[in-house]
Amino acid sequence: MATATTKTVKVRQTGSPIRRNAVQRATLAGLGLNKLGRESELEDTPSVRGMIRKVQHLLEIVE
């Protein structure tokens, strides 16, 4: 069987969730982020891209 390589995107949290609404805090948690400077490597899917777009002002794309 051939294994398919999945594309990934690596993001770093650069903004604080303090004083953000609950939806943005939940989106950060869904991306696996909760503290400044944390990094998370995620599958590059349309749903993850949408989550990144919702909180793009709090994130930095590393790769």
From Swiss-Prot:
Pfam families: Ribosomal_L30. Keywords: Ribonucleoprotein, Ribosomal protein. InterPro entries: Ribo_uL30_ferredoxin-like_sf (IPR036919), Ribosomal_uL30_bac-type (IPR005996), Ribosomal_uL30_ferredoxin-like (IPR016082). One of its GO terms (molecular function) is structural constituent of ribosome. GO terms for cellular component: large ribosomal subunit. One of its GO terms (biological process) is translation. Belongs to the universal ribosomal protein uL30 family. Part of the 50S ribosomal subunit. This is Large ribosomal subunit protein uL30. It comes from Caulobacter sp. (strain K31). The gene is rpmD.
